[in-house]
Amino acid sequence: MDWDSVAAEDVIEALREVEWSASPRSLAEFFSRFAFPRSFSKWMSRLKCNLYYYRTNYFILFVFVLGLALITRPLAILGAALTALSLAFLNDSFAATFNEKMIRTIRHFSPHLAAKMRPPHMPVIRGRSATRKTVYICGQPRLVFVLLGLTASFVLWFTSCGLLWVLYALTTALLMILLHASLRTPNLKARLNTFREEFRAVWRNYSEL
């Protein structure tokens, strides 16, 4: 895959739609080979490739650094967990899986309430939605849960007086991710994995027709 021709918006869209259930890459692979990029275009291409390929590792690193910085503040740790959950809701696969599990659990106690939490049906034309698909969680657009989670996180951080620590941890985690993604040389496995996921996406779209 030619990452030079991939825009940043396309990478964000791919991260939102791709499956995050895959296990993280091994530490041996994660810390295998490092080198400075030869040019700005090479750096941008490497950055986009690594952010996509090591997405699970970066998410774990992000949560770990955030939790480590707030280990002495239980409320702030809870806020960090809510932040991680809210960000995970932005991924289509995670949000849909969470929604199904919640509805399945609620159905055991109240089938009528579970039926109301089902997302509304979208008009379909030739196997595709007429409008851009909206992901629902418990009958509400996922943006509602994302905003509620982030608001609750901010309140917990402010209450625990850990807001500055949170900003410090966020900055540290993002810098570590940016540094690794900039210096880690993409290997053949990363390229082959990208081609495989591209094929799956094309086949999925073809099967929906």
Curated annotation (Swiss-Prot):
It holds the Pfam family PRA1. The keyword Transmembrane helix applies. The chain crosses the membrane at residues 51-72, 76-98, 143-163, 164-184. GO terms for cellular component: endoplasmic reticulum; endosome membrane. It is a multi-pass membrane protein. GO terms for biological process: vesicle-mediated transport. Its main location: membrane. Keywords: Endosome, Membrane, Transmembrane, Transmembrane helix, Transport. It is found in: Endosome membrane. Belongs to the PRA1 family. May be involved in both secretory and endocytic intracellular trafficking in the endosomal/prevacuolar compartments. This is PRA1 family protein A3. The lineage of its organism: Eukaryota, Viridiplantae, Streptophyta, Embryophyta, Tracheophyta.
